[in-house]
């Protein structure tokens, strides 16, 4: 009996261990966590030397620590440390063999440090400091996919805007332009000739033309009426922008920005709505997110309108929410290793076992009319989706078998069982049967009618009871919807092209359909 109790206790511990670890990570392995003894860590970036050896740079409380990741003895050891002003916020970027570092500390002579990395792994050294036009910077950025000789500093004391520095001569950086809208810019994202400036205390992100860096020009704003816009990254094709907000409970928003005159928020993402999405970084079809208390998150954006989390490593053991956990992440090493700055644990290095999401696109249609069913519920596990105006619900996950409960007003519910395969897109049409008890056609004909038919411009409808009226095309797509009380009403059809349509009246218990012909 004692042996049995001991076995059960050990089994319980084993199951608890695997349960706990299942919550800590998915498809991501921690290679190393290096705490050099500083009390705080923040920004991080990477460098690859001419021999292909990889390095990680991380902002520590008292300076910038540099680690050699390809040390032959297998240890990721610190090979250089460049002191700087003591701060909780130190940000880094790298262009060619120079690192550029800013700190959010005023009244220092190290507003932007320039560090030569060319002699690594033997040593690195500070070669210049820039303080001509600002004395602190909260964030420094570059065009991640173009090593053009420019850096962009945000959150300075002098303008609160974005300072553009030419670092062609890293010993003598020169400010060539400033985007100064008159309000605070917290961070920015740069791609080609576009600057996305995050106006933290204003309602949105400024999109700025920087083709002439001496004269940054405001183009338009991506709205965010709730403010706290923090950072962003653009998909590789330039069609979508992922915008993060530095506020607990705010999801990242994915915007379709192809047409500045028709901006559309197409999806949102969060790993936990009690936490905030801090900094996103795009690489290929994936966005790598420093998610504060939720750690590193990797999201498949092969279809940006259906973002799917495919990997994570939770770095923080405490409760969700607030300004703890993972500050930064950097996925740009050729080896595929990912590094990040964890606020209290230091440099973290991961390997990711790449997996792509599969997606399913479900359309609900009416069995009687073949028209799409909108505002229907599609419930998959803990996810609850609403069908759009064309009856579509879209969902994704890693490989597996799933079940969806489908519910729509005036239709019998259905359960849909389906499988998802990695990197596959499947379309499923679900036909729902009406739950409305049919009334004899002769009675419906007396209840609803319209004339003339065919018509050129308008029709007169006669209804003995209130109904929702719809005009559908012959494929069942809803073109017009309007609610009318009982009585006689005029419906203007001038904007419809000539053709054959279906006119439909829907009440709580009945649905009436009739063919309608529109002529020129």
Model-based region annotation:
Residues 1-25, 439:
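Bacterial Sec-dependent N-terminal signal peptides
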Residues 9, 398-401, 405-408, 413, ...:
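C-terminal outer-membrane/trafficking sorting elements
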Residues 22-368:
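Feature marking well-ordered beta-strand scaffolds used for ligand recognition
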Residues 350-369, 431-451, 520:
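Residue-level detector of functionally pivotal "anchor" positions at catalytic/ligand-binding pockets or at interdomain
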Residues 369-374, 382-397:
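Short, acidic Ser/Thr/Gly-rich low-complexity loop/linker segments typical of extracellular
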Residues 376-380, 469:
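Hydrophobic beta-strand segments
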Residues 386-392, 425, 484-488:
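Short, solvent-exposed loop/turn segments in extracellular or other extracytoplasmic domains
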Residues 409-433, 518-520:
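Structured interaction patches on ligand/partner-binding surfaces of diverse proteins
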């Amino acid at each position: 009996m004692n042996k049995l109790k001991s076995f059960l206790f050990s089994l319980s511990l084993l199951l608890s261990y695997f349960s706990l670890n299942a919550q800590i990570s998915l498809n991501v392995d921690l290679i190393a966590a290096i705490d050099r003894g500083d009390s705080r860590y923040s920004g991080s970036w990477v460098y690859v030397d001419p021999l292909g050896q990889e390095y990680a740079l991380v902002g520590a409380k008292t300076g910038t620590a540099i680690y050699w990741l390809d040390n032959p003895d297998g240890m990721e050891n610190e090979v250089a440390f460049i002191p700087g002003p003591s701060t909780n916020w130190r940000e880094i970027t790298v262009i060619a063999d120079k690192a550029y570092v800013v700190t959010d500390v005023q009244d220092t002579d190290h507003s932007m440090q320039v560090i030569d990395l060319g002699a690594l792994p033997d040593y690195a050294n500070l070669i210049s400091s820039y303080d001509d036009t600002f004395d602190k910077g909260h964030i420094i950025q570059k065009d991640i996919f173009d090593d053009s000789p420019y850096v962009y500093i945000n959150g300075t004391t002098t303008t609160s805007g974005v300072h553009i520095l030419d670092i062609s001569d890293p010993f003598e950086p020169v400010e060539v332009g400033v985007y100064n809208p008159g309000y605070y810019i917290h961070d920015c994202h740069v791609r080609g000739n576009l600057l996305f400036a995050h106006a933290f205390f204003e309602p949105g992100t400024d999109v700025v033309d920087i083709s002439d860096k001496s004269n940054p020009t405001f183009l338009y704003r991506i709205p965010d009426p709730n403010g706290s816009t923090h950072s962003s990254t653009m998909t590789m094709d330039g069609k979508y922008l992922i915008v993060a907000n530095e506020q607990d409970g705010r999801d990242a928003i994915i915007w379709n920005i192809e047409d500045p005159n028709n901006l559309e928020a197409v999806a949102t993402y969060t790993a936990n709505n009690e936490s905030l999405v801090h900094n996103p970084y795009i690489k290929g079809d994936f966005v790598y997110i420093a998610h504060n208390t939720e750690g590193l998150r990797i999201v498949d954006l092969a279809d940006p309108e259906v973002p799917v989390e495919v990997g994570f490593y939770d770095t923080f053991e405490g409760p969700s929410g607030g300004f703890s956990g993972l500050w930064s992440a950097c996925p740009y090493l050729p080896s595929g290793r990912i590094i990040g700055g964890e606020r209290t644990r230091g440099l973290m290095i991961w390997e990711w076992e790449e997996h792509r999401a599969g997606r399913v696109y479900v359309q609900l249609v009416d069995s009687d009319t073949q028209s799409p069913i909108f505002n229907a519920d599609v419930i998959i596990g803990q996810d609850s989706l609403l069908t759009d105006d064309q009856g579509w619900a879209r969902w994704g996950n890693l490989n597996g078998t799933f079940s969806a409960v489908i519910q729509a007003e005036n239709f019998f519910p259905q359960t849909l069982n389906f499988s998802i395969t990695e990197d596959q897109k499947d379309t499923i049409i679900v036909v729902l049967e009406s739950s409305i008890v049919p009334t004899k056609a002769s009675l419906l004909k007396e209840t609803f009618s319209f004339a003339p038919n065919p018509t050129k411009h308008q029709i007169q409808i006669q209804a003995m009871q209130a109904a929702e009226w719809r005009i559908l095309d012959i494929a069942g797509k809803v073109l017009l919807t309007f609610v009318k009380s009982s009585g006689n009403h005029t419906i203007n059809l001038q904007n419809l092209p000539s053709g054959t349509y279906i006119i439909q009246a829907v009440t709580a218990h009945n649905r009436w359909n009739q063919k309608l012909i529109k002529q020129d």
